[in-house]
């Protein structure tokens, strides 16, 4: 069976992930890679429906554990219906968020506990972990200011969280970065998109070079 490559992109709100992923997808295609771009929560029909529950339900308070379980359920659907088949075909999967988001947002920032959330997601993803995770590190104040200025962005539940919550998100990502420096690479996302894109491609090309026979 052919084995593809699995790259995930992580970061707090306003880190610029979507913009950079667009550029990365185009660049990798010019380098001859079959790129399957996807996102979490979402990526397949049922997971997109769960996404709407998680991010776009207004006026309904959601229990933190319910939230964590819904993210894991969406991830399972996405994994088995889109990511695994693409990897089996030898594609390069480029995913906007994956398990690290749950560990950070629900595990650390919500206070459930990273290991508790890891256990939930271990059942969902089995052994499917990214070959490379790019963490776009943006200061929460800068990220939230970008979100407020983005006229195209649609509202989601995370936009109403406090600055303290978003600082805990950043703190959680840095804990993961310290624990898994081989897989997770930090990129300073406080800079221009051109600079962030340059460093992003450097990390990806370094990984691609290391995987060649």
Swiss-Prot record:
Name this polypeptide is given: Thymidylate kinase
What are the annotated GO cellular component locations? cytosol
Described by its record, this protein's role is as follows: Phosphorylation of dTMP to form dTDP in both de novo and salvage pathways of dTTP synthesis.
Q: Which InterPro entries match?
A: P-loop_NTPase, Thymidylate_kin-like_dom, Thymidylate_kin_CS, Thymidylate_kinase
Top-level taxon: Bacteria
Family of this protein: Belongs to the thymidylate kinase family.
Question: Whose protein is this, by species?
Answer: Shouchella clausii (strain KSM-K16)
Q: Which residues of the sequence carry a binding annotation for ATP? A: 11-18
Per the UniProt record, which EC number(s) apply here? 2.7.4.9
What is the uppermost EC class here? transferase
A biological process term (GO) from this entry: dTTP biosynthetic process
